[in-house]
Amino acid sequence: MSKYAAIPSPYSHQPQAPDHKSKTLVVGLTGGIGSGKSAASNWFAQQGIDIIDADVIAHEVVVKGSATLRKIQRKFGDWVLNINGDMDRAAVRTHVFTYPDALIELEAITHPAIREAAKLQLAESTSPYVVLSAPLLIEAAEAGLANLCQRILVMDATEDTQLARASQRDALSVQKIKAIMVNQLSREERNLHADDVVLNENDLAALYAQLEPLHQDYLKLAQQLKFAAD
């Protein structure tokens, strides 16, 4: 078994006091493309754990007519909207890829909105603990999502596995997948930020076998947190 398989990392995540008032334990779930974040999220959800998905929130905060989309329009111009008034994601994606400073400006608008929406969902959670899933939980430090978490769980996989899964799932070319991976931390760097790392190289049964003891640990930690807060 790999030393990274469902064991605490010696470089444990040490966040500041979580920036939310909930007594609920928040586990940040992250990992590179094709590492199995969705499979892990689905398993936790099946155990009755509330899942906050940063990708879903990122889409929700820029829906047609939203305050965040209006801010983006004022900042960049009407071209960010398509003929239906929705955000033209392809145009915006091309623009920020061409002009890196534009990405910084865009994230200065979207990240606070994503963070606030995540905090609202945390406040509404009723499960013993919450999983906050974010592909760039560590990379996008300025978004502040990692500081909402008391613990970080990293899904880990070799590059070959990532490429195989992502190409099968998303029908992406190897070149496109590698371009995405360039903007993500390396496995080694990401694992340094983790409290727990699951090496996801086999089938779902093997993955679930690693997640079960972590789930039990998180239930215990959640109880401890609530007792300490009372």
From Swiss-Prot:
Q: Which superkingdom does the taxonomy of this entry point to?
A: Bacteria
Molecular-function annotations in GO: ATP binding; dephospho-CoA kinase activity
The biological process GO terms on file are: coenzyme A biosynthetic process
KW Nucleotide-binding (keyword) present: yes
Keywords in alphabetical order: ATP-binding, Coenzyme A biosynthesis, Cytoplasm, Kinase, Nucleotide-binding, Transferase
Instruction: Say if the entry is tagged with keyword Cytoplasm.
Output: yes
Coiled-coil spans are none
Q: Which Gene3D superfamilies does the entry link to?
A: P-loop containing nucleotide triphosphate hydrolases
Q: What's this chain's function?
A: Catalyzes the phosphorylation of the 3'-hydroxyl group of dephosphocoenzyme A to form coenzyme A.
Q: What does the sequence similarity comment in the record state about its family?
A: Belongs to the CoaE family.
What's the protein called, per UniProt?
Answer: Dephospho-CoA kinase
